Amino acid sequence: MQTTIIYITGVYDTLDLFTQELKNAFESMGYASFTYDARLGEVSKQALIECIEDGTKRGQRFFCVTFNNLGYNLSLPAGMTGTGMLLRQDIFQGIGESKGANSVKKEINLWETYEIPYINILMDHPFHYEKPLQNAPATSVVLCTDRNHVRYIRRYFKNIRYTD
């Protein structure tokens, strides 16, 4: 069974350099790679979804390895399930819900939908990432460069099940 590691680039040059080195190392160990380029927005997102959909049909496994929460909030397009199927919009609207302009629908997180482990390497203190860590995918694994950062996450972010 082939394993593909998904990388996220296009936000910070320094992190892109780290990512490229990780990619080179993992490819030398036989892992396949997919790079999501944030500069390409929806084009890159669609290519990622197609890669996951096609790979899943062949029994392929996926992991995302990224830095500083990049891509934690990637979501599926409105009305799309994790099987490539589009749902009718009214399925998302329950009886009695407002359908007005202020109505907010929860976006469907890509990592959770496809059950892809989201390995997040924090280069900075977690204090700087309160919102992303509070809203981290359920599949998150947070790796820290400092043991004090690990203790901080374990104390303040109970939603993150795995950190080291």
Please report, for each region that a protein language model flagged, where it lies by residue.
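N-terminal pre-catalytic "stem/leader" segment of glycosyltransferase-like enzymes
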Residues: 1-113, 117
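Catalytic core of nucleotide-activated saccharide and alditol-phosphate transferases
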Residues: 115-164
